[in-house]
Amino acid sequence: DRDSCIDKSRCSKYGYYQECQDCCKKAGHNRGTCMFFKCKCA
């Protein structure tokens, strides 16, 4: 699911989103980005 990382991966205020990236890559996406403190996979 495209948004399966939203709840699992925290996004901090100032650009550190390694957990989001890792979650998205494991899920087979190219990258993860944070929007409004939520992880989105792309």
Curated annotation (Swiss-Prot):
Expressed by the venom gland. Keywords: Disulfide bond, Ion channel impairing toxin, Knottin, Neurotoxin, Potassium channel impairing toxin, Secreted, Toxin, Voltage-gated potassium channel impairing toxin. Gene3D superfamilies: Knottin, scorpion toxin-like (3.30.30.10). GO terms for cellular component: extracellular region. Disulfide bonds join 5-23, 11-34, 20-39, 24-41. GO terms for molecular function: potassium channel inhibitor activity; toxin activity. It is found in: Secreted. Pfam families: Toxin_17 (PF08086). InterPro entries: Ergtoxin, Scorpion_toxin-like_sf. It comes from the Eukaryota. The presence of a 'disulfide through disulfide knot' structurally defines this protein as a knottin. Negative results: has no effect on voltage-gated potassium channels Kv1.1/KCNA1, Kv1.2/KCNA2, Kv1.3/KCNA3, Kv10.1/KCNH1/EAG1 and Shaker IR (with inactivation domain removed) and on intermediate conductance calcium-activated potassium channel KCa3.1/KCNN4. Blocks human voltage-gated potassium channel Kv11.1/KCNH2/ERG1 (IC(50)=16.9 nM). Belongs to the ergtoxin family. Gamma-KTx 1 subfamily. This is Potassium channel gamma toxin gamma-KTx 1.9. It comes from Centruroides tecomanus. The lineage of its organism: Eukaryota, Metazoa, Ecdysozoa, Arthropoda, Chelicerata.
